[in-house]
């Protein structure tokens, strides 16, 4: 934190893991400008976490006072999956992942699947930002890579507040029937956890969480990217949601030599794209 912008660890309640469960606590780092003015809001969503992770989740700095930002962790991942020693000091206990393999958690249970909760976590995070006096909710943006790209699509599709623009990079969770024919993960996890479901039933279940379908609800401007050598979230799975977007204000960048990674020029590209659409 600085005099320009204060950084807070925020804890908020999100939907239960199942309809009859208890609310789930999720967390993020919130950066609030201190000048008393309203600022554009940028939501940041993380990629797929690691089990027993020890890396420190990114935290915003206090010097960039142009934006109100939320670096948000969905249930069981990142901030919600770190020991106290692997976070910036906050005086709280270890936070533990109770879900095991996130993609497999309650697989096949539409109202209890992991990504149902995760998508709603992101919706709740936007609702939190709307409560802050410094948030200009008429200028709302989201960005993320891999899983974070999928979450950017999901929140733009499902949020109570319309997004101005989003920036999904090498996005996850796209066009499952083709996705599972192209690469082994998460197809192997899905097939190992589908129980008695036929493939047709499995894909019908996954259709609720497919960015290709979520994209049909999105009117925000979109800047996207894909690596043509990506063996985790291949180009086709990125193009499928992009093609289904309602918006005509969209652009996708292809990086011929890039795998599953973030381009070195990506942050500059997306911030220029966002700034061009700010009021």
Tell where the protein language model's regions lie, with residue ranges.
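Hydrolase active-site cap/lid region
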Residues: 151-198, 254, 262-265
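Short beta-strand/loop motif that positions the catalytic acidic residue
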Residues: 218, 224-226
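N-terminal cap/lid segment of alpha/beta-hydrolase-fold proteins
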Residues: 1-36
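C-terminal catalytic histidine-bearing segment of alpha/beta-hydrolase fold enzymes
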Residues: 232, 239-279
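Short beta-strand element of the alpha/beta-hydrolase
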Residues: 27-30, 38-49, 69
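Gly/Ser-rich "nucleophile elbow"/oxyanion-hole loop immediately N-terminal to the catalytic nucleophile
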Residues: 101-146
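Cap/lid segment of the alpha/beta-hydrolase catalytic domain
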Residues: 60-61, 66-120, 178-187
């Amino acid at each position: 934190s600085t005099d320009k912008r204060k950084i807070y660890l925020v804890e908020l309640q999100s939907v239960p893991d199942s309809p009859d469960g208890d609310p789930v606590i999720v967390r993020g780092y919130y950066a609030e400008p201190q000048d008393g003015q309203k600022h554009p809001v940028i939501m940041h969503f993380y990629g797929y976490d690691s089990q027993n992770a020890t890396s420190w989740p990114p935290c915003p700095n206090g010097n960039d006072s142009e934006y109100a930002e939320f670096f948000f962790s969905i249930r069981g991942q990142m901030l919600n999956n770190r020991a106290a020693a692997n976070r910036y000091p906050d005086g709280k206990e270890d936070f533990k992942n109770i879900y095991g393999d996130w993609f497999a958690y309650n697989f096949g249970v539409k109202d209890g699947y992991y990504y149902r909760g995760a998508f709603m976590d992101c919706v709740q995070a936007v609702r939190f930002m709307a409560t802050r006096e410094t948030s200009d909710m008429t200028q709302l943006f989201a960005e993320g890579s891999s899983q974070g790209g999928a979450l950017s699509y999901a929140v733009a599709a499902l949020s109570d507040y319309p997004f101005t623009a989003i920036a999904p990079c090498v996005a996850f969770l796209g066009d499952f029937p083709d996705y599972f024919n192209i690469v082994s993960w998460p197809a192997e996890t899905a097939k190992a956890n589908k129980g008695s479901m036929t493939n047709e039933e499995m894909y019908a279940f996954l259709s609720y969480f497919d960015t290709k379908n979520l994209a049909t609800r999105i009117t925000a401007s979109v800047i996207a990217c894909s690596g043509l050598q990506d063996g985790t979230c291949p180009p086709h799975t990125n193009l499928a949601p992009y093609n289904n977007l309602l918006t005509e204000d969209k652009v996708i960048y292809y990086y011929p030599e890039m795998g599953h990674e973030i381009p070195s020029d990506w942050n500059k590209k997306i911030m220029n794209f966002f700034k061009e659409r700010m009021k």
